A protein has these predicted regions:
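Conserved AAA+/SF3 P-loop NTPase catalytic/coupling segment centered on the Walker-B
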Residues: 213-235, 270-275
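P-loop NTPase catalytic core of nucleic-acid-dependent motor ATPases
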Residues: 99-209, 213, 364
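DNA transaction DNA-binding modules
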Residues: 322-447
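Long, low-complexity, charged/polar intrinsically disordered regions in eukaryotic proteins
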Residues: 302-335
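A short helix-turn-beta junction within AAA+ P-loop NTPase domains corresponding to the substrate/partner-engaging
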Residues: 269-290
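Conserved catalytic/switch belt of AAA+ P-loop NTPases
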Residues: 228-251
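N-terminal nucleic-acid engagement/recognition segments and initiation subdomains in replication
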Residues: 1-125, 140-144, 375-380, 391, ...
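AAA+/SF3 P-loop NTPase mechanochemical coupling elements
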Residues: 204-209, 244-262
Length: 447
């Protein structure tokens, strides 16, 4: 901190006069006195702000000592405490409390500020951006996918915790600049992160803090049926609950970020019989791109500024949805099939049922006898088998079977829900057909 000038000493003296005094003389060591100093001292005034994105306290003006970033540090606290001593204020606990009060009353949101300051030039870019930088096909699905992703990112900033489950996945195009596209789309490098590699990490939720666009590359590249369920569940969450260092109790942290995927694997989507609606694959091709996004980074950033400006114009109009129309949803499902893995388990179950002569099967039986497993199935594996059967019966790939309504006993597997063969009515030697229970009830017979 530079040497004090005569004006600085005069300022300190003037501020001391407005501080509450102790009965026996001297300044009272109160939180309010600390707040008064922080609001009036020329070094502190308008310098300490709560960042609503990172939920950390930032120092946003030069303070007279060496600093490496905006976030308040322990070193900053030492300098602040030293200056507070000039006012006769010596309680670190009260100074810290005053800093939190002043910061909270002077909060800001850097991304909201950025978006609100944009002025759109009227040129449409959303329909062209993914082709320009990544060689994606210019069609309605590609345009809608990017538009919904941008609008979802905007809404998450202005309405943290809003429901938004979509992940835009850029597929293929080795060296096309997929990750660079998302990094530049986040505007500032600190608003982007690709550090989310495991969902079972104890610190996973803290890794979301302060970021706007989260790229999930490794998890998408290695996704399987189990992990894709975990990713789907993770994408569906709207908040995390944890405490940050200076807090005593955990608090709900509403999500302000959106998630993006990048992979070179063409079959990155496991077969998901409940639907892969959250994952929006967009194939890219570096050879078809007009420019590489890093060829002229300044020009690319200016383009992306206008991309967000166009999206903000749509957002402010209120005329948008964060979901696909039925027609686009159908187009998406067709597109997703090109990126799905071969469903070997379904094929094995279909083949087993074709040769099976019994009248009933359950998921544990299929797990052991159709798929050849010796261990007991995990819950997600049982669920996957049920999904195969439900989808297969619905789409006609499994014929002659239906789910039985009540659980039944299976000799090797205990009481289980399962499926039973749909057979033609049994006919006896005299030509009489045996009624099913349902038919008998409909005819009023007392069975």
């Amino acid at each position: 901190m530079p040497n004090e000038s005569e004006n600085t000493r005069s300022t300190i003296s003037n501020i001391r006069k407005i501080l509450s005094q102790a009965e026996k003389g001297g300044v009272q060591n109160t939180i309010q006195n600390c707040v008064t100093v922080l609001q009036n001292d020329p070094i502190f005034a308008d310098s300490i702000r709560l960042n609503l994105l990172s939920e950390r306290i930032d120092i946003v003006k030069p303070m007279g000592w060496q600093r490496s970033g905006p976030t308040l540090t322990d070193t900053d606290m030492m300098y602040i405490l030293r200056r507070m001593e000039k006012y006769g204020l010596y309680s670190e606990k009260r100074v810290s409390a005053a800093i939190r009060i002043v910061a909270n009353e002077n909060h800001y949101h850097p991304i909201r500020d950025y978006l609100n300051d944009l002025k759109w030039d009227g040129a449409e870019r959303i329909s062209h951006a993914l082709h320009r930088f990544l060689g994606a096909v210019e069609d309605e699905l590609t345009t809608e996918a990017l538009k919904i992703f941008l609008l979802g990112a905007i809404k998450r900033v202005f309405h943290p915790g809003c429901k938004f489950e979509m992940m835009l996945c850029l597929v293929g195009g080795q060296g096309a600049g997929k990750s660079s596209f998302f990094r530049l789309l986040a505007i500032k490098d600190e608003w982007f992160s690709d550090d989310l590699r495991r969902l079972d990490d104890d610190n996973v939720f803290r890794k979301l803090q302060g970021h706007w666009i989260m790229e999930m590359s490794e998890m998408i590249a290695t996704a399987n049926a189990k992990s894709i369920e975990e990713i789907k569940s993770f994408l569906s969450k709207q908040k995390e609950t944890y405490k940050i260092p200076y807090e005593t109790h955990p608090a709900d942290r509403l999500r302000q970020c959106v998630f993006a995927g990048t992979t070179n694997r063409q079959d990155f989507l496991p077969r998901d019989r409940t639907g892969n609606r959250r994952f929006i694959p967009i194939p890219v091709d570096a050879a078809q791109a007009e420019v590489h996004i890093l060829d002229n980074e300044a020009e690319s950033r200016a383009y992306i500024d206008q991309l967000w400006a166009e999206a903000m114009t749509i957002y402010n109009s209120g005329d948008y949805k964060l979901t696909f129309s039925p027609a686009m949803q159908e187009a998406l499902q067709i597109c997703q099939k090109d990126f799905m893995q071969e469903d070997m388990q379904a094929g094995m179950i279909y083949a087993f049922l074709e040769d099976y002569t019994g009248d009933r099967v359950c998921s544990k039986q299929l797990y052991a006898e159709a798929l050849g497993n010796l261990n007991l199935p995990a819950e997600w594996e049982t669920r996957a088998i049920c999904e195969i059967m439900t989808a297969g019966i619905a789409n006609g790939e499994i014929k002659g079977w239906t789910a039985h309504k009540a659980a039944k006993r299976y000799p090797k597997y205990g009481v289980q829900k399962g499926w039973e063969r749909v057979t033609a009515a049994k006919v006896d030697a005299d030509g009489f057909a045996e009624l099913t229970d349902e038919e008998a009830q409909q005819m009023g017979f007392p069975f």
